[in-house]
């Protein structure tokens, strides 16, 4: 209670914290740029980049602070003015109402968020935002970003908690030359920027040398080649799109030779992890960030956007990317507006007489169905009111909606119709089902469902050079359960792929190989051109004994280990990073550092389950099962309904010969997470082991109905039915198991400790 009382005092008594501007001499500021580039500055003014973040003033605040009230989760918040300040009375970190001053606005349309200063240099994003859309569109109102969830002060999504912290979650992409400056010892921030918004040098890089070149200052000649710019964005220079009458689609006059522009945009328009202490303009994206693959929960099996993944991952899947299209082919890079309104931007390259006709789209002119974007870039709403378009430019596939439940553009408009109706319409129009480029939905759906027969289709996908690299990288990341001689060959090829994302994904799989083979394959990757590959290689080699390597190899490994540590310290305020450090220290035998890292993760976010589970597993590995159990019970006391914790506790109790208590915990885990075939299987085995074979069989039969291709469940059904004398049932399950086993024939892998959870 003392801690919260002190904190409440601070909340009520501090003055607004101003974030300092950084005046590093290599960043010169927009005004200097505008002295030569006035036209570009004019386009940029009032753009979303210009208005990305602003001090809260009467000119910048869009929300109604006239005493308006808004109620969510039982808390009524009031927005009001106090002299020239904008204030909100709402629930704070202790759940009590208090008055907070709005320090900054964040964004402008279709919503505007507000930032509040807290001790330790923190800015927190209020969970209630202003709907900036016109009133006739439902806007001009306060709304909660999680309208269907009861977000109270003890929830991880509450506005005062870590996941709504501006410094670590938002700041880098809303200001120029943002330096987070987190101090792990003080657990505080000294965040600085060169400019508050996304200005010229956010994209073009520091301009001091460019100014020296332009003004012919002493030594300017040495910068003449790139005009003093670290980021040279010239991929469209001297390029035109040549119409092709036979296809109706224009072709780039020369191949795109680099990806500087796309990667520059991807820095903020991608779902990614930070892997370096400081971004350097002009260096490869994967030297500083690791973009998410087409993972479950992030993307649908066919690659359509699902979670808030922005646009980079979807664009990499597209024919546009393969054809050499860059972001600025469609978007004017200063105003951010489309180069032509509506379908006009598409018709720059796609002939209107071929594509803007009913013969192509089968809809009335000027209807939504005749819009290129509505059909090929269907939107998905984020932050309640912000529709964002999928940039994979795909052919609508309602047939996949029928078989896999993925969304499709047709039913976005035709909400009253079924997916089968839409699929039949497409079949009637074309006489077949147009496939498009993205043909991996069935494969990824199978791997996500644990289908043991999915291995062969994964290999086919990986081997197809026409498949976008991000899909091949995703497939390689899913090879683990299907490792055999064939897939090992594909893995080895992936390590030397031209695409760094493919190499990084493949390198991450090496930890599942036997130690000797892993060392043989991973050592050369410590010298890869990009950091993302090097740190994955180092992580996979972290447990290799020093004596197994020569001096040069050991030096390379130590360098890679340090790069990995630095990559995690770049997000030291996050529990995921601290958990990853703990895992590394365990592999390295640095036990005190491992325990400290896990405990730091828990301190940063007591609701972060992997840190608790890994700390308990750390104690188990030291033969301190009592400490492991105590850790898990402490976690469960603070978090109700977390399956992973009950499962880990059940295993701990089994190791302590407390079988009856273990069954209770394992049952709880299986109940809380009925989608986990592993939890249900282990629960059934525990029932059988405690003399409850009939109950075990009932659980297994139910599990088999849900997971018909799970070989562990089938194997247990064979064994348990034989034990019960059910020969017919045992034989039936055995035949099915045998039919699946050849496809699931595993490569003999070195068991990575499956109880240790990586931070995400």
Model-identified regions with their sequence ranges:
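Amphipathic alpha-helical scaffolding segments comprising HEAT/armadillo-like alpha-solenoid repeats
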Residues: 452-462, 484-496, 514-526, 548-565
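Register position in tetratricopeptide repeats
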Residues: 512, 540-543, 587, 621-622, ...
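Helix-start (N-cap) detector for alpha-helical repeat units in TPR-like alpha-solenoids
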Residues: 469, 500-503, 531, 575-576, ...
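Short coil turns that delineate tetratricopeptide repeat
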Residues: 572, 606, 640-641, 674, ...
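Hydrophobic/aromatic packing residues within the alpha-helices of TPR/SEL1-like helical repeat arrays
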Residues: 458, 564-565, 598, 632, ...
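Primarily the internal scaffold of c-type cytochrome electron-transfer domains
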Residues: 31, 39-107, 113-119, 127, ...
């Amino acid at each position: 209670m003392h801690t919260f009382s002190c904190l409440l005092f601070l909340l009520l008594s501090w003055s607004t914290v101003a974030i300092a501007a950084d005046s590093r001499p290599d960043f010169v500021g927009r005004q200097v740029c505008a002295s030569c580039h006035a036209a570009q500055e004019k386009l940029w003014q009032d753009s979303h980049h210009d208005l990305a973040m602003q001090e809260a003033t009467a000119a910048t605040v869009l929300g109604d602070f006239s005493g308006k009230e808004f109620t969510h989760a039982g808390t009524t918040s009031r927005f009001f003015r106090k002299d020239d300040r904008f204030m909100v009375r709402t629930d704070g970190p202790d759940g009590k109402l208090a008055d907070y001053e709005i320090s900054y606005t964040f964004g402008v349309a279709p919503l505007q968020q507000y930032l509040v200063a807290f001790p330790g240099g923190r800015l927190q994003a209020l969970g209630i935002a202003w709907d900036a859309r016109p009133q006739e569109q439902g806007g001009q109102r306060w709304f909660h970003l999680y309208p269907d969830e009861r977000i109270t002060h003890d929830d991880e999504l509450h506005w005062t908690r870590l996941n709504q912290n501006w410094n670590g979650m938002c700041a880098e992409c809303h200001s120029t030359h943002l330096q987070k400056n987190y101090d792990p010892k003080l657990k505080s921030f000294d965040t600085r920027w060169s400019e508050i918004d996304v200005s010229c040098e956010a994209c073009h890089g520091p301009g001091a040398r460019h100014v020296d070149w332009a003004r012919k200052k002493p030594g300017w000649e040495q910068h003449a080649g790139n005009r003093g710019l670290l980021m040279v964005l010239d991929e469209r220079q001297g390029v035109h799109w040549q119409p092709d009458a036979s296809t109706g689609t224009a072709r780039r006059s020369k191949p795109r030779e680099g990806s500087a522009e796309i990667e520059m945009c991807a820095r903020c328009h991608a779902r990614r992890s930070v892997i370096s202490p400081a971004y350097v303009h002009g260096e490869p994206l994967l030297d500083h960030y690791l973009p998410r693959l087409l993972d479950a929960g992030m993307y649908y099996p066919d690659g359509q956007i699902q979670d808030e993944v922005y646009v980079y991952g979807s664009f990499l899947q597209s024919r546009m990317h393969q054809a050499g299209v860059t972001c600025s082919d469609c978007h004017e890079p200063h105003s951010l507006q489309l180069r032509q309104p509506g379908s006009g931007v598409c018709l720059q390259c796609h002939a209107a007489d071929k594509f803007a006709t009913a013969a192509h789209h089968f809809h009335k002119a000027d209807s939504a169905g005749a819009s290129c974007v509505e059909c090929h870039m269907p939107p998905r709403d984020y932050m309640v009111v912000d529709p964002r378009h999928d940039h994979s430019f795909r052919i609508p596939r309602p047939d996949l909606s029928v078989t896999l439940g993925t969304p499709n553009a047709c039913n976005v408009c035709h909400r009253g119709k079924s997916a089968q109706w839409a699929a039949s319409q497409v079949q009637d129009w074309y006489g077949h089902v147009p496939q498009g480029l993205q043909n991996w939905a069935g494969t990824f759906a199978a791997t996500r469902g644990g289908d043991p027969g999915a291995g062969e289709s994964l290999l086919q996908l990986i081997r197809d050079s026409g498949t976008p690299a991000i899909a091949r990288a995703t497939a390689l990341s899913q090879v683990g359960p299907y490792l055999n001689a064939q897939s090992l060959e594909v893995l080895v090829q992936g390590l030397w792929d031209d695409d760094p994302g493919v190499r990084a994904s493949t390198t991450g799989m090496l930890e599942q190989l036997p130690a000797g083979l892993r060392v043989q394959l991973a050592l050369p990757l410590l010298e890869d051109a990009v950091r993302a590959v090097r740190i994955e290689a180092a992580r996979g080699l972290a447990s290799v004994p020093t004596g197994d390597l020569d001096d040069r190899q050991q030096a390379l490994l130590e360098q890679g280990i340090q790069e990995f540590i630095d990559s995690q310290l770049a997000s030291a305020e996050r529990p995921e990073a601290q958990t990853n450090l703990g895992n590394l220290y365990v592999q390295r035998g640095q036990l005190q550092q491992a325990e400290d890292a896990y405990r730091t993760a828990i301190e940063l976010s007591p609701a972060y389950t992997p840190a608790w589970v890994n700390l308990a597993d750390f104690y188990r590995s030291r033969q301190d099962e009592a400490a492991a159990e105590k850790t898990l019970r402490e976690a469960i006391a603070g978090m109700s309904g977390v399956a992973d914790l009950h499962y880990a506790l059940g295993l701990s109790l089994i190791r302590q010969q407390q079988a009856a208590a273990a069954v209770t915990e394992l049952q709880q885990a299986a109940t809380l997470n009925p989608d986990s075939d592993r939890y249900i299987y282990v629960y059934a085995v525990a029932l059988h082991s405690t003399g409850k074979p009939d109950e075990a069989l009932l659980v297994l039969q139910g599990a088999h109905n849900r997971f018909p291709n799970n070989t562990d469940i089938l194997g247990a059904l064979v064994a348990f039915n034989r034990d019960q004398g059910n020969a017919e049932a045992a034989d039936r399950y055995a035949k099915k198991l045998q039919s699946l086993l050849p496809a699931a024939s595993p490569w003999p892998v070195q068991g990575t400790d499956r109880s240790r959870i990586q931070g995400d």
